[in-house]
Amino acid sequence: MALVGTPTNRTSIDLPVDVSNEILQKAQDSSAVMKLARQIALPGRGAAINVITSDPTASWVGETAAKPVSNPGLETKVMRAYKLAVIVPFSNEFRRDVAALYDALINRLPGALGQKFDNTVFGGTAAPGSDFDTFASVTQHDIETDTYAGFVAADGDIATHGGIMNGIVLSPQGKGVLLAATDGDHRPLFINSVAEGAVPMILGARTELSKGAYVAGTPNVLGFAGDWSQAVYGTVEGVKIDYSADATLDLGSGNVINLFQQNMFAVRAEIEVGFRADTSVFNALVDA
């Protein structure tokens, strides 16, 4: 949603530190990428990130022989902060108690921020800029035809590029494919028991579930596997909050809300976030 016109009754809210931290934590909890990737403090002007592309090599030497010199391969990437925002309308009853407003923010906004961040990293949404890495063009492996073989192929490809598969993000659709996978005796391959219904690990790699990991296409992307030690995200500061009581909200498709006329107000949440990764050590998991 977007604000239309120039609001005349807009106020900035300084959230208490504990509330701001809780909102940010909720966003992180709703994002599989934020759970698996490393987090760094990101200055507003951006930061240079050193990515190790190869390790130094040790060699055997004689007792008095000169010791070999080997340098690691390094690549420098610039991580920039891009703004992610959402507006949510509320009824005026929320104004009666500030705590109710905070509760509403905590319950509704972080999930929207986290899911959009995931979907952007996974290529379902266009990157906000050239210094934001995505997995839109990574190597694909079919996990629908032969699920186990597909994961083994992904693990091998990641290893070929110098990574170790240590994290897998599945969409709900991808989880369905895994739950349907059975061995020759019709026993489930990827869950410990039917009662659990969850996929805790695959080939020793931790798994997370995210709606943002599904990208419709030909084929459809059901999830991603990779070496998450080679992925970094950063945030400039906590979630910024503004509200307006007399703006007009354009909901799209000709739908408009007049906040003053309908006894409502709208809250806008923003976060500045960046993402960088060695995309060669990530694979997309697709259907046939």
Show which residues each predicted segment covers.
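Extended oligomerization regions of viral-like shell subunits
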Residues: 43, 138-265, 269-271
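Alpha-helical scaffold segments that mediate packing/assembly in large oligomeric complexes
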Residues: 75-78, 85-163, 185, 270, ...
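Short helix/loop capping segments that flank catalytic or ligand/cofactor-binding pockets
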Residues: 57-61, 97-99, 177-180, 233, ...
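Assembly/oligomerization interface modules of large self-assembling protein complexes
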Residues: 2-84, 111, 151, 281-282, ...
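Short beta-strands and strand-coil junctions in structured, solvent-facing domains, enriched
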Residues: 36-39, 96, 274-276
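Intrinsically disordered or highly flexible coil/loop and linker segments, enriched in small
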Residues: 33, 55-58, 118-126, 163-164, ...
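Short loop/turn segments at secondary-structure transitions that flank enzyme active sites
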Residues: 55-57, 85, 94, 115, ...
